[in-house]
Structures are given as structure tokens and as C-alpha cells.
Amino acid sequence: MQHTSSDTLSENSIKLLQITDTHLFASDEGSLLSVKTLQSFQAVVEQVMARHVEFDYLLATGDISQDHSAASYQRFADGIAPLEKACFWLPGNHDYKPNMSSVLPSPQITTPEQVELNAHWQLILLDSQVVGVPHGRLSDQQLLMLEHHLQASPEKNTLILLHHHPLLVGSAWLDQHTLKDAEAFWQIVERFPMVKGIVCGHVHQDMNVMHKGIRVMATPSTCVQFKPKSDDFALDTVSPGWRELTLHANGEITTQVQRLASGSFLPDFTSSGY
């Protein structure tokens, strides 16, 4: 499935806004580790609007829901409506794809494999979900699809989206739940120098590193944050956030993480897991 943006293909840079790991519930009182996830999600959307953040597309990189309910996905769809931008989403390990599909067709949300953003850039969206387990894996079909789109547009700078982290983050408990076939993934992408960036969710923290000449980014959750470099499960004191990216015509990526005010939506630090 290929998606061409409905806007005139711009010759200029593309601005993207990534939100991830919203962990929503059917109930508006649903909480994860004592953080009411609908409220924290809404606070992020409200702050994006209050700051007049300019962006062309919204990226939602999985774990939209915590309870698998159709209502939780509708809450997400309703929540992003004020942003008035097209949203591309993909599943995480907590998502239930039949209920994700229940809100489609949507005026904002689509689930393409590939998006031509403009004359210079494409997105490729991968499904790394393995039903019933927290780690990720790319099926042979997903790997073939990735290779196909890279071969079909060898001149386009490419940003790849998936839920699970394709690089270890240095937290033993989280790195058990990484992308299990990362080697097969990297064997494909490193053959294509136009792959400029990879964006994921899952780890509930900021990561921005270069690997094999490719920028690899993970992004804070809109709710609970995991403490970096912690061997055992641990929560961080930093606030929920989002990522802003600019894809430049020359293939460069500039990006920054933004957060809610310090002290916003603090979790239960006595929790030993979830």
C-alpha cells in the first residue's frame, strides 16, 4: 500500500511531529503507574498547540492503547483532531490491530506502508509487533516490503518508522524486548545510503545516536518515562514529551525533544514493573 500526500508535493523541508506510547484506556480515568494517560496525552496536544508548533504530518509509533479497547483508539483519534494534520500510525506490542482498524477510515489517520512526503523524502512504516509478547520482530513480508520500497525509490531520502528499538539502549530489562531480528533489518538498510533516519517508540525515553551513518531516534512517551541506563525496571523523573523533526531537502535531519513542564504527571516510583 502506497500513500501520496494529498498536498502539493513541496520542494521545501518537511516538518514532522512524533508522539508515541500514549497507552490510552477506554476509561478517561485509566492510569499507568498512577499516571492518567488520557490527561497526559491531552496535555501534550494542548502544549503543542499552545507553542504553535509547525508541522506537516503527525507520526504515532505504537502503544496507542493499554487496554486493547476500540474506545481507546477512538480517544486517540478524538485527541489529535484539534491538530488538524494527517497522522500515520503503526502498532506497538500493547496494541490490538483489529481494534486499531475499528476507527478507520478516519479523516486524519491512515496506516500506509510508504508515504511520498515530497520530491526529496519518503517514509516507510514497519509493523514490528509479535502478538502476545513485548519484544519485536519483522516478518519476512515486512523485510521484503522494506527492501522493495528502498529499491523502488533509490533517489529518495528515507525515514523509517517502527515501534521497537533496533539498537540496544543500555537498559538490560528493556533490551530484552528489543527488535529481535535487528541484524536482518540492518543488513537491508545499510545497503541503501539514502536511508537517513530511523524513528521508534517503545523505550519511553530520548535516544538520538548515529549508527552505520544513520540517525536512530527514540522518543519519550506522552505518559510514563523509563530511566535510561537502568539494568532493572526504573522510572524517570522527567516529564512526558514529544519529538519534532525537520527533514531537509539535502537529506539532513534536525530534531529536538520537547517536554511538558518539569514535575508534570509524575508516576508511582515504588512500582516494580507494569
From Swiss-Prot:
SUPFAM superfamilies: Metallo-dependent phosphatases (SSF56300). Fe cation 2 binds at D63, N93, H163, H202. Binds 2 Fe(2+) ions per subunit. The keyword Flavoprotein does not apply. Induction: Positively regulated by the cAMP-CRP complex. Keywords: cAMP, Hydrolase, Iron, Metal-binding, Nucleotide-binding. Pfam families: Metallophos. Disruption phenotype: Mutants show increased levels of cellular cAMP. CDD domains: MPP_GpdQ (cd07402). This is 3',5'-cyclic adenosine monophosphate phosphodiesterase CpdA. It comes from Vibrio vulnificus (strain CMCP6).
